[in-house]
Amino acid sequence: MTPRIRLIAGVALIVFGFALFGWAIYAGLNPTAPFETRLAPISADAAKDVEGFGLTPERLQQIEVSTKDERRPLATGVVARDEAGRLTPLVWRNQVTEPIFFAEVSAADAAKVLAAIREHTPQDAVVLAWWDCSRAIRLVAGRAAPLDDAEARGLLLPAAWSAAGAAERARWGAGVPTSSANDFTRFMDALLDSDEARASEALKKLADGKPAYVAVRISDAWMLAAARPQQLSIAYKDFAATG
């Protein structure tokens, strides 16, 4: 190899190295989502499974979360949209151990809970609940559930997906007034407050003087921990099956 050819080859390698370095910086600043969320019109079979919600098929969609490395979806569900276009998860199935976005909930269980809220709360009552549950209460139970969150705080994302979390929270927070964040922050503060009297008073203020009920699910503890990890930590461990 002549000196000139060696020089050209060396320059080419340097340029190629800078190109790789530049791409690494670009990829770091513009991370590609490690998963894909797809929405599709609900099938006839899926619509039949969720008849208990009393919503027309036109308001329902099927949702699927998948990655290119897995042949089967990581999570599937049924969502509804309200007049503002907000997505409301009604049914959720996680196909992996770690919850993806939401905890598992079946159509039968969700319909039973929402029917109980409708049956046991006065029509003028205010139900305070996590933002996804609030949407379902408004849509299906027909009760005032004013809390919502444009930031969709508490969405359950695996740690490896944290870089894409903002885009996914924006999807679930779409259609929600940004002003809702203040009341939802106060709701989380009340749930974490160790002073019961002060927490109760804060919840009453959120209900604006109307009869108030608080609907809290076990899964809300997970979402609260995801939203406020510095104040609430939850750990879990898988135990091998023993025979």
Give the residues covered by each predicted segment.
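Short, Lys/Arg-rich N-terminal segment immediately upstream of the first membrane anchor
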Residues: 1-6
